[in-house]
Amino acid sequence: MAAPLRRDTLPDNGSYGVCRDGRVFFIDDEARATTWLHPRTGQPVNSGHMIRSDLPSGWEEGFTKEGASFFIDHNQRTTTFIHPVTGQISTENSDFRLQDQPGGRMLKQPSSTISEASTTVTTSTVDSTSGSKGSRSSGRVHSFGKRDHAIKRNPSVPVVVRGWLYKQDSSGMRLWKRKWFVLADFCLFYYKDSREESVLGSIPLPSYTIAPVGPEDHISRKYAFKAEHTGMRTYYFSADTQEDMNGWVRAMNQAALMQTHTVKRDECGHPDHVNVSEKLKKQAVPQTNHINSYVIPKPEVIQSDGLPEDKREGFVGEVEIQVTPREMEQARGKSPASRVVEVEVLAPGSTPPSRVASRAPSRAVSTPPVVQRNGTPIEQNGMPGCQRGATPSAQTPVQVQRRSTLEQVENWVKVQKEERHGLVSTESTVPRRTPPIHPKYGTMDKYQSLPKTSRQSPPAPHHQLPSEYKYSHDRLNHFQKIHGHTKRPTTHDNTVWQLFEWQQRQQFRHGSPSAPVYTPAPDYSTAVSSTRNNSDVSRSVSVPPTLADIPPPGPPGARLMSPRRPHTPAERVTVRPLEDRPIVEVPPSNSPHRLRSYKSATIERRSMPPSAYITHTVSAPSLHGKTADDTYMHLKKDLEYLDLKVSGTEALKGRPAKPVKVAESDVDVTLSRLCEQDKILQELEFRLSGLKDDKDKLESVLDVSHQQMEQYKDQPSHTDKIAYQQRLLQEDLVHIRADISRVSTEMERAWDDYSRMEQSVEQLRDVLQTQMTLCTSPQEKNQLKRELWRIEDVMTGLSSTKETFKITVDSVKNPERKLVPSVIESTVPSRCMTPSAAEVRSPQRSLTSSPLPLPLDNEDLRNRHPVPNWEEDDAPPRPPLPLLYDEDTPPVVPPLPKETSVIRHTSVRGLKRQSDERKRDRESSYSNGDYRLELRSYLSEPELPVSAHGADHVDPGYLTLQRRGLSGSSSRINQYGVASCSLRRDLELSTMERPKSALERLCSGEPQLEQQSQPQRVRMSVEEQLERMKRHQRALVRERKRNLSQGERHHSRASTRPVNSDPGSALFVEPYRPASDEWLTVRARPVMELELEPLDFEFDITRELSTPQKVWIPQRLIDDESDEDLSPEEKETRSRTVAKIKTLLSKSSMRSSEQMDFSDLDLALQQQERIMSVPRALATEASIKRRQVTAKAMSEG
């Protein structure tokens, strides 16, 4: 875009200046001309256009307002669509209808237009009726500086500094990402890594302010600094060390001031050299009309008068102005009209011999000099003038020159008015896209410098416009759409119109619609008097500036900023009364932020009362056709009118504000708080959704990185890079997840508050409805009805978001998928409740796990002591329990729910059989068809070797005993011996109550969690029970035959109580538990291998066949139904049923004793089974009948 400035290579008679937008132009003092090309290199400097390698020297590429590319020849001062080397039109222009600008006179309007903000004049454009093509480049404006739209770096420009920096993202979570930064060509480029392959973005640094972060930035990162610019985005960076940060800040500040590292300052602080260099390599600003000077073609009659023949076209020159970098910084960052310049157009046949001297008052003899050769810039109305590089003054102090500046300018203006009295074309003090007074004398060259009317000069929706101008372009577009005129009349002065336009331009000097605006005082006495008789020919800003480009005159103290709103339409001007216009003296400042804060503090809009001034709209088109005197009178009348309207301003200021009652009732307060809580929930939900999106993106990127790690695992160089990226992403992911959790917690609290408030609102509504029902007064009813309507309106409005909040909160509290298995609590409470690791790892084996995971300590085996055995009794053996209870406090067991259990236990044989079945069920993990848990014992490996071999997977800390199936003989332990182990009880659970037995747990239903986790228990049917009883009876008969044949020796041996085949049932614990921290000793009883299934009770055939004795039925086995609730008919029915059952049982017992034949035991067994099935069927039938009678009685009652 630009070549290096190389000020040291400028000729002795050459100097340079800098425009408002940073463009550099060069001044030839001998020829009194300006040019965009460097005198030695022949290349433009910081011109705003692109310098392509395939273009000849002095050529650049620009873009029209519609986006079509064209080429600028600074040598011949022409533009064309045809490439100068290839002779072809660019393929990018295939979508445009190109039309070359004619070479006619100014009266003939070409099809091209002038870009207002970028000061572009092009030779061709798209048809003005093509609205679709006119919006092609609008999307490119907003994406400037990112990736494809970044500035292209010039490899030939030396790099000032490069290295790693952290940069904060501009959107989303504002994460800090590490990037490789390169500072070159006054622009900061950043890349993905140090290879600098493809640029990720670029930041043009001129006019930026680089400084460490402050508390207002809310940046807690160490070694952080920022690049700030008015009306543009603030960039935040972070270095690794303090030294790196200082180096970057120093280098970036020099680039922001467009200084090289060779700039030296003297002891007084003034520079010896001001090296104003290019701002960027590719600014992408379509500033097409970057011309050297405006050329006035030869008319029919022209008087050269001292000018050579080749100078008859009359290049408009520049007046030499010398400034210091301090003044340049003020003018660039602060002064709105610091570089507003104007072009002086000479009329044909009227150029006097002293014309050159009048254009350059510093060289004129008849006029006082504006500034001396080594002076300071002119300041009119407190505004610095056009600036360019110079040497510091050593003759007079700066303060003395500044005091004489205004007087010198006024004298010079008077001289110019006297010298140019009667001339056709004069100069104006406010340059702004106004047409020439007599366009018939000038022809339009392709390399145009003068602007056309405002209608012909719309802002170009250019290719890639920097953000510092996009707001002004949008506003000017809107301004031109409002005014439907094609061109303004050219027979008047247009001074006030230019003042208005100048105000609009100054408002956007930094691209911000809310930037301070310098508006002249409403009483333009000085301004109008000094410019009333001057007709202006303004120019495009892209023309190199001249001396006469000065801001509107007026006393410095009367210049103030308009407190306009940022989006006030462009054709409106806010005029305030004289008494409310404070005098603002703006002192020169080196910092742009000091000046801005000083101004904003002086005329803060919020400090004024609402009625302190009245906004009066002045329509710009209404000024058309009026002379300067008419316009001045019109403004004066408006001001007088406003003075009358705001005569009571002081009274209004002193008047106290009227108190406001926010809430009329408690319903209003509650509803307002509920709405506030809804707003809080909405904000939290928005933050949560953004965090979740960021988390999902990071996780997706991490998934890809994991796949790449697997793919490149054989390449260490790739894996190291991927691992580094993963660490950065994982760090960001941790922060995001932490934020998600924090926001979720806040949202849960807010949701609880919301629910509470909603409940209070519902209660209020109920109370109001009750009051309205009881109220008799119509007025009170109406008031209550209105309150109810308010509640209904608010609740209905909040119902749309309520479900969304509820879903969001529930998703955090109760996620849909639960991948982690929950730990199942032990079934039997014990003093060692800690679940083992294997139970958590393998939940499918939980059905066979023991509820008593007792850790084994090998050292405690030394402390063995014998445990006394239980005494044998005649009663059926008790099922083995996990622990032994004290006989003094037997467990209280609730009754069983089934009546069939009562019938089954009414005989001694039935009780014995059921006892045997229960014992076998426990051994085979079944109990009456119900699933049961087997005991898990912690035994050492030498004690149970068979159990260790039989287990599929046993953790090293303990061994699980094998589960015995229907045929339990295969799982018996083929080993005799005594094994004892000491078990340590948990100290924390020493004070718990004694655990309940299996029957208690079965009937009480307390362990709800385990019952839910286990599969549903299904009780065995009657047929299954009968089949099981038959198998058991056959086994008993075979055993009886064998016992009778073997004799008394074997009978006596077999009559002893057999030992349970399950080793777990052979472990008995001593009943005494003196202390919680003592050791419990478990001793294994000797186990003997039997060929047949063991017998659980003594066999005596005479006892079996005799009349059964009366057996006491425990209370827990009787149906718990009180007689108080039964009617007399039910009691009678029940007594008859019980008598019938007893009779049947006694008869069946007597028949069996009479009819049994010992010769045929098998036949007797079958007969006995048939007899046993009869009472069972009768009992079932009796139960059904009893329930039917009960239901009938209840229905009749």
Swiss-Prot record:
Q: Where is the composition biased (Basic residues)?
A: 1032-1043
Answer yes or no on keyword Coiled coil.
yes
Coiled-coil residues are: 678-799, 1016-1044
Q: What is its main location?
A: other
SMART domains for the chain = PH, WW
Chain positions covered by the region annotation Disordered: 98-148, 348-384, 423-467, 508-577, 830-928, 1032-1064
How is this protein annotated for GO cellular component? centrosome; cytoplasm; zonula adherens
What is the role of the protein in this entry? Required for zonula adherens biogenesis and maintenance.
Q: Where is the organism placed in the taxonomic lineage, from the top? A: Eukaryota, Metazoa, Chordata, Craniata, Vertebrata
Compartments where found: Cell junction, Adherens junction; Cytoplasm, Cytoskeleton, Microtubule organizing center, Centrosome
Q: Pinpoint the WW domain residues.
A: 8-41, 53-86
The molecular function terms in GO held by this entry are: delta-catenin binding
Kindly give the InterPro entries that the UniProt entry links to this protein.
PH-like_dom_sf, PH_domain, PKHA4-7_PH, WW_dom, WW_dom_sf
Looking at the record, the residues that make up the PH domain are 158-257
Per UniProt, the keywords (alphabetical) are: Cell junction, Coiled coil, Cytoplasm, Cytoskeleton, Repeat
Q: Where is the composition biased (Low complexity)?
A: 111-140, 528-546
- Composition bias (Basic and acidic residues) maps to 568-577, 913-924
- Protein's name in the database: Pleckstrin homology domain-containing family A member 7
Biological process annotations from GO: cardiac muscle cell differentiation; epithelial cell-cell adhesion; regulation of heart contraction; zonula adherens maintenance
